[in-house]
Amino acid sequence: MPRSLKKGPFVDGHLQKKVDDQNTKGTKNVIKTWSRRSLITPDFLGHTFAVHDGRKHVPVFVTEAMVGHKLGEFAPTRTYRGHDKDDRKARRR
C-alpha cells in the first residue's frame, strides 16, 4: 500500500540537508547514507549516493527514471551465487 498523499514523501532530514548543501555549492560529491527508506525526489537528480546494503556501501547514481522510488531498491541486500552445477562425474562415483 503506498504512502498517503496528504503525508507527502519521506526523506530523512540529514540526507535532505546534505543534498541541499551540495546543490547550493554546486558540488556533486558522493553522499554516504544508511537511509534506504528515503524516497528519491527530483532534487536528488545527478547525485551519487553510497547506500548501505548491510555489508558495504553501494554507489547509486540517481537518474530521472528513479524519482519516486526508494534508495534501498537500487542496493540489493542479498547475493545470488547460483545453483549447484549438475556434475555427472560426481554422480557416477
Curated annotation (Swiss-Prot):
The keyword Ribosomal protein applies. GO terms for cellular component: cytoplasm; small ribosomal subunit. Gene3D superfamilies: 30s Ribosomal Protein S19, Chain A. Residues 14-23, 81-93 have a biased composition (Basic and acidic residues). GO terms for biological process: ribosomal small subunit assembly; translation. Residues 1-25, 74-93 are annotated as: Disordered. PROSITE patterns: RIBOSOMAL_S19. The keyword rRNA processing does not apply. InterPro entries: Ribosomal_uS19, Ribosomal_uS19_bac-type, Ribosomal_uS19_CS, Ribosomal_uS19_SF. GO terms for molecular function: rRNA binding; structural constituent of ribosome. Belongs to the universal ribosomal protein uS19 family. Protein S19 forms a complex with S13 that binds strongly to the 16S ribosomal RNA. NCBIfam families: rpsS_bact. This is Small ribosomal subunit protein uS19. It comes from Beutenbergia cavernae (strain ATCC BAA-8 / DSM 12333 / CCUG 43141 / JCM 11478 / NBRC 16432 / NCIMB 13614 / HKI 0122).
